[in-house]
Regions:
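A short SAM/SAH-binding and catalytic strip from SAM-dependent methyltransferases
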Residues: 1-17
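A short, flexible beta-alpha/helix-coil linker loop
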Residues: 7-9, 82-83, 118
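Short, hinge-like loop/turn segments at secondary-structure boundaries
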Residues: 1-2, 51-55, 129-131
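SAM-dependent methyltransferase
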Residues: 15, 35-102
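Short beta-strands and strand-loop turn motifs
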Residues: 2-5, 37, 114
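C-terminal lobe and adjacent flexible extensions of AdoMet/dcAdoMet transferase-like proteins
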Residues: 94-138
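A short glycine-rich, Lys/Arg-flanked "PGG" loop and its adjoining helix->strand segment in the class I
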Residues: 16-33
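A short hydrophobic/small-residue beta-strand
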Residues: 34-35, 110
Length: 138
């Protein structure tokens, strides 16, 4: 079972994320692998681009980002030839310790933390992502 591209962390209730990992654990056969991929909150905080604009044809996208507590907030403004839309995305700024604790609470055995699918070792100061490789006990 895989949860890639920060598929967790969008609910205001952290227990929703735990329930998702618990459900994945139930679905796994003994000895099977679970992979969880989330943004490294420390890097997001450090390298946050507060605002940028981009054009896609005639459509202008303005993205504003900020961190409030342990949440990364992205405010997306879309202007399509005078018709405006606004979307707000909120995602949890994960730490490796939070990911490890969630894996352990689900009863999985953490094998490794990496900085993405290339399996470079996770470094809390430089890794863009936290990828947990965990196995369901036999």
């Amino acid at each position: 079972v895989v949860c890639l591209f920060t598929s967790l962390g969008y609910s205001a209730d952290r227990m929703d994320d735990q329930r998702a990992v618990d459900a994945a654990t139930v679905a796994l056969k003994p000895g099977a692998l679970f992979v969880l991929d989330v943004l490294n909150g420390a890097i997001v905080r450090k390298d946050l681009v507060e605002e940028n604009c981009q054009m896609e044809g005639e459509v202008r996208f303005t993205l504003q980002r900020r961190v409030e507590g342990d949440t990364i907030i992205k405010d997306i403004h879309v202007d399509d030839q005078g018709c405006s839309h606004r979307f707000i995305e909120r995602v949890h700024a994960w730490t490796a310790e939070e990911v490890q604790a969630m894996i352990a609470r689900a009863g999985l055995l953490l094998e490794e933390l990496t900085d993405g699918p290339d399996t470079a070792p996770f470094d809390p100061v430089t890794s863009d992502r936290i990828v947990a490789w965990a196995r369901k006990p036999r």
